[in-house]
Amino acid sequence: LAASPSEIWSASISGSTNRARLAAAPVVAGGKLYVIDADARILAFDAKTGARLWQTQMPSEGNGRSLFGGGVSALGDKIFATTGVGDVAAINAANGTILWKKQPGGPLRGSPTLANGHVYVMSQDNQIYALDQLTGETQWSDAGTVQSTGVFGVAAPAAGQGTVIAGFSSGELTGYRYENGRDLWGDALSRTN
């Protein structure tokens, strides 16, 4: 990074409001930059020039809930996105076509984790879901202890070496077998005052 970086390009996307919060980081893959905005639109830009390549609106049945959260991840020729109303979608990275869209459970806050042929997502109500990357069908799910209050963001699950690790807002940390969600281990992390 240069001592005095200069702006190469910028783009305007829908930002935060009282009913929608923009908290997702952009993702760069294959020479493109992908981002989800506060209105649940996924946008693709040329990473070098900033030219908008496409945008796709994530349709949602919604029920008046706010669009707090969501995120994007990229793998191969697909983008995977989550929204604050609980949608998970696979999107064609070349043209923005939605390949599948599912609602596995409650509001989703963080970006999806992509590994082992699955899309792993965490919900605000302490659920982890493993969806098939090709079909979007739920392969397994599990729940942490439900909390009456929580933080705005939820950490994405970590995945590696055949294990998926979920950190829940209750302080629980659980390791799962990626293919079936079997608990491998768990621990409760204490809160600090």
What annotation goes with each model-predicted range?
Residues A3-V27, Q55-L75, I98-A115, T138-Q161, ...:
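Extracytoplasmic beta-rich repeat domains
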Residues D37-A38, T83-G84, S123-Q124, F168-S169:
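Structural signature of WD-repeat beta-propellers
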Residues D37-Q57:
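Beta-propeller domains
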Residues N18-L22, V28, Y34-D37, L43-F45:
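Structural recognition of beta-strand segments within beta-rich domains
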Residues D46-T49, N92-N95, D132-G136, R177-G181:
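Short loop/turn segments that connect beta-strands within beta-propeller blades
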